[in-house]
Swiss-Prot record:
Family: Belongs to the CinA family.
CDD domains to which the protein is assigned, alphabetical: cinA
Lineage: Bacteria, Pseudomonadati, Pseudomonadota, Gammaproteobacteria, Alteromonadales
Top-level taxonomic group: Bacteria
Short name of one Pfam family: CinA
InterPro entries for this protein: CinA, CinA-like_C, CinA_C, Competence-induced_CinA, MoaB/Mog-like_dom_sf, MoaB/Mog_dom
Name of the protein in question: CinA-like protein
Amino acid sequence: MSAPKVQLLLTGNELMTGDIVDSNSAMMAQVLKDIGLGVNRKVTVADDLALLVNEITYMASTSDILIINGGLGPTVDDLTAQALALAIEDELSQHPQALTHLTNWCHQRGAELNGPNLKQAILPKSCQIIANKNGSAVGFYVRFNHCDIYCTPGVPHELETMLIKQIVPAISADLPSDLITDVTRLQVFGLGESSLQKIINEQLPQWPTAIDLGFRAGMPLLEVKLTTNTKKGLALKPIWHNKLADVLGDHLISEIQDKPKSLAEHLLHQLQQHNLKVTTAESCTGGLIASKLTEISGSSMNFEAGYVTYSNKMKTAMLDVPAKLFEQYGAVSEQVVVAMAKGSLIKSTADLTIAVSGVAGPNGGTEEKPVGTVWLAWGSIDNIKTQCLLLPYKRVKFQEFVAAIGLDLLRRYQQNITSIPNYIAERAFTDQ
C-alpha cells in the first residue's frame, strides 16, 4: 500500500508580505519525513475567507492528510475555523472543551476572558479538540470524506509540540503496516553542507538510492539524516551508515538517540566519565563558553570556574598575564592566550581549560589582525595547544562560533584526536 498524500495549508497576511518567514512548513515536513511521509503540496494564502474556503475544499479532495496552520487566534483576521466549517458544510458552535481550556488559560494568567478571546472556542461542531498546553488556542481535527484535517496554531513552539506529541502519533497509528520508516540522525561539526556533500560525492559515489541522505544546517551543529522506507534500504543501511561514519571521521560528534545534544553536553559527558574539571578564560566571547557549560544541569561536578577578562588590566590582575606581552604581541596573540590558559589553570584546581582572545568587531581590526581574528588555547597545564582563525561573521555570530569551536577543540583533546580541522580559514602569523 502506498503512503498517504499529505498537503500543508498555511494562512496569514504576514506570510504573504514577508513580515514573517515561514519556518513552520519546513519543520512540519521534517517531522513528517521521519515517519515516512512526504509533503506533495504546500499552499500559503492570505487571511481571506473565500480563498481559504476554496483551498480547503480543493486540498481536502486531493489529499489524505491536510494540515492547516495558522488563523486560530482571537482577531478578525483569524479565519480558519470559519473557513473549515464552510468548506465541509458544518456549523460553528461553542465547543465546551475549548471553552474550558480557554477559561483555565486566562485564569492562570490573570487575564480577562472577553469577547475576542471567546472566538477561539467557536469551532466546527463535528471537530475533535487537540490540546495546546503552550497557548490559548486549541487545535482541532475533522474527518471529511477520505481526508484527515488537522488545524494547528501558527506559533512555532505551540505547533511543534502539538505536532510531535499528538498529531504524529495519531497519523502513525493509521499508517499501513507495511510502510517502513527508519531514520538515523547524526551530529556533525566542522563541516558545512556543501563541503560534506562534496566529500560524499567523491568518497561515496555509489550511495544507494534506497537510502535518502539529507542535511539540516544548525547553529553550530550540522544534522545528517539517513532515511529509508523500503526493505532494501533497511538491509543496506547499516553498511552505508558505517561507510558514512568513516568518511565523517572525527567530525562526527554522535548519533542522535532521543533529542540532539549540544557540544557543551558532549564535552561535559566526557569530563564526567574521566572525573575531570574544566575552567575557561574568555575575552572576546564575554563568558559565553562558561554560560554554555553551566546552563546544563549537573555541570557543577565538572565546571570549576570561568574568568571573563575583557581588558588587558584584568587579564593581568586575574590571570597573571605579563603586561609586557600586550606591548610586544597585543591582546589578540598566541602568547597572550597561552598565558590566559595557564593562568586559569593555576588559579583554579581544574584539569583542562579553553582560553580565547579575538577581535569581535565591527571595530578594532587592523591590517595585521582584521575583525574576525581569534586565538584559541586549550589543554592541560603541561600541554597547551593553540590555533588562530579568521571568522568572517558579525559580532554575535562570531562569538557563537568561537564558543562552539573552543568546546569542540577541548572535546577533541579529551578524545586524543590529534588532527585539528580547518574550521574556516586558518591564519598563520609567520612573523611571530
